[in-house]
Amino acid sequence: MFNRTTSTVANVDPELYAAIEQENRRQEDHIELIASENYTSPAVMAAQGSQLTNKYAEGYPGKRYYGGCEYVDVVEQLAIDRVKQLFGAEAANVQPNSGSQANQGVFFAMLKPGDTIMGMSLAHGGHLTHGSPVNMSGKWFNVVSYGLNENEDIDYEAAEQLAQEHKPKLIVAGASAFSLKIDFERLAKIAKSVGAYLMVDMAHYAGLIAAGVYPNPVPHADFVTTTTHKSLRGPRGGVILMKAEYEKPINSAIFPGIQGGPLMHVIAGKAVAFKEALSPEFKAYQEKVVENARVLAETLVKRGLRIVSGRTESHVMLVDLRAKNITGKAAEAALGAAHITVNKNAIPNDPEKPFVTSGVRLGSPAMTTRGFGVKEAEIVGNLIADVLEAPEDAATLERVRGQVAELTKRFPVYG
């Protein structure tokens, strides 16, 4: 028998507990600007820490390979029904353990090795799983990549020409470092013109889409994949939304195709997050996410930095650092020393190596979760510029750390 009072992480594993506590402190004391990170709610974390972690449930609600699944069936069905309502989808699979596995599930269901797929180039803001040669998607399939035009918007004309020339079986839309709105309707027309499936990976934009502040791809795409964390603010995991006609092959592709028993405790966390995302408060939050990102970008431009694509229409922006004569790697380190967390990121046609880069990617979801508004977003933008202008100046870093401490103390993540 386990005693809940004594069988705590602190008692059982003090070394691990110390690392967890240090990470908790870091999250409270640093300003988080990595676009793919956010803070999930205590309710979501509680669901993940529940006894649901003990239950095996291979299969789907009402059709399991194990007994004793009557209550986890309720949990999974709640998640399915809520995510369908949230995005207006005909069908949903909530079992993928990640966004990458959601993408793999669609590929496994609808493609064969050697088929041609077309996705956004990683060098122009796409994602590894959209056909990068280092990823399974780039090794198993013949990949054609589209990218940005001279205005650093998606080159839809070139994408259409590529589709007509190569006749891909599946076109992937979505990005990991692209700040503008994506024309999903136009990409759907391109896909239809060549008889291709359209899969939209909305992992970065899902929270914004749920709140109606970014275009919804569901009416236009055959498949929509997403993570459940990032801007959606749920647990780490994935989801596939699809037209009803594809539900059976997608379900078979996830189980038994690429996964075994689903993580029922995480699916419970997803269900909680979807309920939270259906609330008016979540819509208001996402409106602030977009507003804060706009102010942050405008502040950086005023301080002499260039935003790739000229602006942001979402939560994310890619900052070209070349005007400040600093690499993304050096900027990430300097800002980290000032307790501002970002990630280095390649800009389009970046002359630097992938582990060096000429840019950083910034996002507003996490700082907005902790309560920052446009006033704080402007302050953060100026603090970033201060550091980038004097990345090795100890006095500047100390001053910025002090201002960060004042902000984070005023706006705790978990009160």
From Swiss-Prot:
Enzyme nomenclature, EC number: 2.1.2.1
GO CC field: cytosol
Pathway of action: One-carbon metabolism; tetrahydrofolate interconversion; Amino-acid biosynthesis; glycine biosynthesis; glycine from L-serine: step 1/1
This protein's UniProt keywords: Amino-acid biosynthesis, Cytoplasm, One-carbon metabolism, Pyridoxal phosphate, Transferase
Modified positions (N6-(pyridoxal phosphate)lysine) in chain numbering: K230
SUPFAM superfamilies: PLP-dependent transferases
EC primary class: transferase
Catalytic reaction(s) noted: (6R)-5,10-methylene-5,6,7,8-tetrahydrofolate + glycine + H2O = (6S)-5,6,7,8-tetrahydrofolate + L-serine
Domain of life the protein comes from: Bacteria
Family: Belongs to the SHMT family.
Protein name: Serine hydroxymethyltransferase 2
Organism of derivation: Burkholderia lata (strain ATCC 17760 / DSM 23089 / LMG 22485 / NCIMB 9086 / R18194 / 383)
Designated gene of the protein: glyA2
